Amino acid sequence: MLMFSRFRYIFFAVALLSGPVCAGARADLSAFTRGLKTLQGHFSQEVIDTQGRVKERSNGTVALSLPNLLRWECDAPYKQLVVADGKRVWLFDPDLNQASVLLQDNEERNSPLIALIDPIQLDRKYDVSEEVAMRDGLRWLSLRPRGSTEASFQSASFGFSQTQLARMELVDNLGQRTVIAFSGWQRNPVFAVNTFRFTPGKNVDVIGDR
């Protein structure tokens, strides 16, 4: 269930793709977000502990619909599904036949999403900077919480390759690093009506804020 504790990080991507706050400051981000309403692609993720050891690897597909809909589906090594429908965030684990659910507003309030879409909060809570040198062939935009913010991370970085979002790197408050590489982006696909919905089956054990 490590991914469930990190799903809020994906709201970084949703917030960045919403555009108005950060896009004007960074040419790559501006080009990537221009005219964007929906997005679909593939991801591979590694969680690395403070000793540099890989604790978790996963890969799958991600779908976004601005401003706040998300489908994050792990295909390997284990099936797992996260759906944010605008009101709730669902995590479904088919192996356990269990679904956990949280109110999306509560999670967003405790995540950088609210700051990224609110310029006043962004300036108050975070230092946003562009890394001077390229790293791994990418141009990087970095966020770091200021002062006593309640953010659940130490730093976040977004790597761009030729105006495409290629990577996210996040360091949590325990010093663990999550690295997510993206590929195969499709811009503005038309999604089926149930893409961002989750309805638990009758025999699914549901835990949380229904």
UniProtKB/Swiss-Prot annotation:
SUPFAM superfamilies: Prokaryotic lipoproteins and lipoprotein localization factors. Its main location: periplasm. GO terms for cellular component: outer membrane-bounded periplasmic space. Disulfide bonds: none annotated. It is found in: Periplasm. InterPro entries: LolA/LolB/LppX, OM_lipoprot_carrier_LolA-like, OM_lipoprot_carrier_LolA_Pbac. GO terms for biological process: lipoprotein localization to outer membrane; lipoprotein transport. Residues 1-23 form the signal peptide. Belongs to the LolA family. PANTHER family: OUTER-MEMBRANE LIPOPROTEIN CARRIER PROTEIN (PTHR35869:SF1). Monomer. Participates in the translocation of lipoproteins from the inner membrane to the outer membrane. Only forms a complex with a lipoprotein if the residue after the N-terminal Cys is not an aspartate (The Asp acts as a targeting signal to indicate that the lipoprotein should stay in the inner membrane). This is Outer-membrane lipoprotein carrier protein. It comes from Xylella fastidiosa (strain Temecula1 / ATCC 700964).
